[in-house]
Amino acid sequence: MISTDAVAPAVDVKGEAGDRAATGNIFLVGMMGAGKTTVGRLLSHFLEKTFYDSDREIQKRTGVSIPTIFEIEGEEGFRRRETEILSELMNARNIILATGGGAVLSGVNRAMLKHGGTVIYLRASIDDLWRRTRHDKNRPLLQTSDPRARLAELFVQRDPLYRETAHIVVESGKRSPRHLAQSLAQQLTISSRTG
């Protein structure tokens, strides 16, 4: 069992993240099931920014589901498409983008995100992630004989990359998405004013 007891403070703003959030882009990173899409939509409403979800953008452009892309092109093909979408969205302004859980696997993606806006890592425990994803058949990486163990492996692999990329780390497990988004919006607004 992976211990997730030692977690970051609820909101930890580093450096000029608040300034970037007030005028620029906000990118949400984290594991599948962390709440990126739900919190991102709410945060976009509170901060009056346009919301995008990279997985949905890929689906809109290809006309097929993520599992179908994995089946036809493999994970490598999907990751290539993900990088293309991220690269295009880096030209946008005043957006909130929920990235796919594996977006941080690419060093190119990590650099684009880190330098293109404020990166918020929505972190949740393995138990919370499992509870949110265990019945979702649209998660190709969890279609294994032991999906919970696979989720734990992905967490161990990706957590350091999320932390490396993020300007802000937020525990998303125990608060409602609305409360979390309100708290983030307030903190980002305060940080941009006191910068």
Swiss-Prot record:
<feature type="binding site">
    <location>
        <position position="158"/>
    </location>
    <ligand>
        <name>substrate</name>
    </ligand>
</feature>
<dbReference type="GO" id="GO:0009073">
    <property type="term" value="P:aromatic amino acid family biosynthetic process"/>
</dbReference>
<dbReference type="GO" id="GO:0005829">
    <property type="term" value="C:cytosol"/>
</dbReference>
<keyword id="KW-0460">Magnesium</keyword>
<dbReference type="InterPro" id="IPR027417">
    <property type="entry name" value="P-loop_NTPase"/>
</dbReference>
<feature type="binding site">
    <location>
        <position position="139"/>
    </location>
    <ligand>
        <name>ATP</name>
    </ligand>
</feature>
<dbReference type="Pfam" id="PF01202">
    <property type="entry name" value="SKI"/>
</dbReference>
<keyword id="KW-0067">ATP-binding</keyword>
<keyword id="KW-0028">Amino-acid biosynthesis</keyword>
<dbReference type="InterPro" id="IPR000623">
    <property type="entry name" value="Shikimate_kinase/TSH1"/>
</dbReference>
<feature type="binding site">
    <location>
        <position position="79"/>
    </location>
    <ligand>
        <name>substrate</name>
    </ligand>
</feature>
<feature type="binding site">
    <location>
        <begin position="33"/>
        <end position="38"/>
    </location>
    <ligand>
        <name>ATP</name>
    </ligand>
</feature>
<dbReference type="GO" id="GO:0000287">
    <property type="term" value="F:magnesium ion binding"/>
</dbReference>
<dbReference type="InterPro" id="IPR031322">
    <property type="entry name" value="Shikimate/glucono_kinase"/>
</dbReference>
<comment type="function">
    <text>Catalyzes the specific phosphorylation of the 3-hydroxyl group of shikimic acid using ATP as a cosubstrate.</text>
</comment>
<keyword id="KW-0479">Metal-binding</keyword>
<dbReference type="GO" id="GO:0004765">
    <property type="term" value="F:shikimate kinase activity"/>
</dbReference>
<dbReference type="GO" id="GO:0005524">
    <property type="term" value="F:ATP binding"/>
</dbReference>
<comment type="similarity">
    <text>Belongs to the shikimate kinase family.</text>
</comment>
<feature type="binding site">
    <location>
        <position position="101"/>
    </location>
    <ligand>
        <name>substrate</name>
    </ligand>
</feature>
<keyword id="KW-0057">Aromatic amino acid biosynthesis</keyword>
<comment type="subunit">
    <text>Monomer.</text>
</comment>
<keyword id="KW-0963">Cytoplasm</keyword>
<feature type="binding site">
    <location>
        <position position="175"/>
    </location>
    <ligand>
        <name>ATP</name>
    </ligand>
</feature>
<feature type="binding site">
    <location>
        <position position="55"/>
    </location>
    <ligand>
        <name>substrate</name>
    </ligand>
</feature>
<feature type="binding site">
    <location>
        <position position="37"/>
    </location>
    <ligand>
        <name>Mg(2+)</name>
    </ligand>
</feature>
<keyword id="KW-0547">Nucleotide-binding</keyword>
<dbReference type="InterPro" id="IPR023000">
    <property type="entry name" value="Shikimate_kinase_CS"/>
</dbReference>
<keyword id="KW-0418">Kinase</keyword>
<dbReference type="GO" id="GO:0009423">
    <property type="term" value="P:chorismate biosynthetic process"/>
</dbReference>
<comment type="pathway">
    <text>Metabolic intermediate biosynthesis; chorismate biosynthesis; chorismate from D-erythrose 4-phosphate and phosphoenolpyruvate: step 5/7.</text>
</comment>
<dbReference type="GO" id="GO:0008652">
    <property type="term" value="P:amino acid biosynthetic process"/>
</dbReference>
<protein>
    <recommendedName>
        <fullName>Shikimate kinase</fullName>
        <ecNumber>2.7.1.71</ecNumber>
    </recommendedName>
</protein>
<keyword id="KW-0808">Transferase</keyword>
